[in-house]
Amino acid sequence: MKTLTVHTPSHSYPIFIGNGLLPQAGSLLKPHLGKRAAIITNETVAPLYLGTLQTALDAAGVSHFSIILPDGEAHKNWQTLNLIFDGLMQNRAERKTTLIALGGGVIGDMVGFAAATYQRGAPFIQIPTTLLSQVDSSVGGKTAINHPLGKNMIGAFYQPQAVLADLDTLHTLPARELSAGMAEVIKYGALGDIGFFEWLEQHMPELMTLERAPLTQAVYRCCQMKADIVAQDETEQGIRAWLNLGHTFGHAVEAEMGYGVWLHGEAVAAGCVLAARLSEQLGKTSAADTARLAALLEAAGLPSAPPVFAFEKWLAHMSHDKKVSGGIMRFIGLNRLGEAVITEITDTDILRRTLQPYL
């Protein structure tokens, strides 16, 4: 097992990474749990892992109840959030009841937002079961639900008490979900660590077959990079925005196609290539870097191009992006592979040229 600590102005918390951790969850998480916990999961994850977690909590002497939600990005909304609140209140959850998010990014984001707002703040713990959530969304305290006009538009910064990433849960992940998670892994190398990017180019076949040593190293490195960035910029006033590489274009794809049609990681993959193309238009990164990024994404079974839709629709979706400031769109681009940069765009003709092959 590998561990690291996330340090933020609000508080510090551990991340546990390894195999076979879920049966040990009671003992590992006991210092971060109250006397009672609410396990919140979905219909897909519950049959696989809920029983193991319940047994682990029983062994640690932690009482618990469970709330099982519908699965999928399409359910990341007010209606499902209210199902969480219904379950908490029906079970008389108190402010000190620990909410445990058992699932992927959708569960983690919603449970975190529920924790941030239930009785003005309850503790919560992340137990991510997908690659995407283990390397990205479970760490750093971003919580949210979607709105029909934009992804993750309603939420809060609210840090967990701990994160437990059991890599064994990835063995039940569909191949498409594994690829989607790998988009976020590749993103880290592209935005801030060329050495890691080159390592991914060498080890992608082993990663896609979930070989234990390289997988542990990849998840650890991603969490380490995110922890370092979050420690410097908890509420995304500066460099934390780098973590949104590919997300402005990607969120537009998700919103246009309908949440869940393209998986988040698939949209981010195409978005990363578009961000590199935009950087080319601005005279920053090279066409060779863009091609190299696209090739690595394709090696992970990911799309390197977005679906085709009208430029006006792209603009409409991107105008709702959370990075828009003073009406000016802000994109995360690349100076070169391994070096992200925040770019303000006032000339939409540059965006049109970037997107022209997909209009």
From Swiss-Prot:
Binds 1 divalent metal cation per subunit. Can use either Co(2+) or Zn(2+). NAD(+) binds at residues 71-76, 105-109, 129-130, 142, 151, 169-172. Zn(2+) binds at residues 184, 247, 264. It is found in: Cytoplasm. It catalyses: 7-phospho-2-dehydro-3-deoxy-D-arabino-heptonate = 3-dehydroquinate + phosphate. It holds the Pfam family DHQS_C. This is 3-dehydroquinate synthase. It is an enzyme of class 4 (lyase). GO terms for biological process: amino acid biosynthetic process; aromatic amino acid family biosynthetic process; chorismate biosynthetic process. Keywords: Amino-acid biosynthesis, Aromatic amino acid biosynthesis, Cobalt, Cytoplasm, Lyase, Metal-binding, NAD, Nucleotide-binding, Zinc. One of its GO terms (cellular component) is cytoplasm. InterPro entries: Dehydroquinate_synthase (IPR050071), DHQ_synth_AroB (IPR016037), DHQ_synth_fam (IPR030963), DHQS/DOIS_N (IPR030960), DHQS_C (IPR056179). GO terms for molecular function: 3-dehydroquinate synthase activity; metal ion binding; nucleotide binding. Its cofactor is NAD(+); Co(2+); Zn(2+). Catalyzes the conversion of 3-deoxy-D-arabino-heptulosonate 7-phosphate (DAHP) to dehydroquinate (DHQ). Pathway: Metabolic intermediate biosynthesis; chorismate biosynthesis; chorismate from D-erythrose 4-phosphate and phosphoenolpyruvate: step 2/7. It comes from the Bacteria. The keyword Chaperone does not apply. Its EC number is 4.2.3.4.
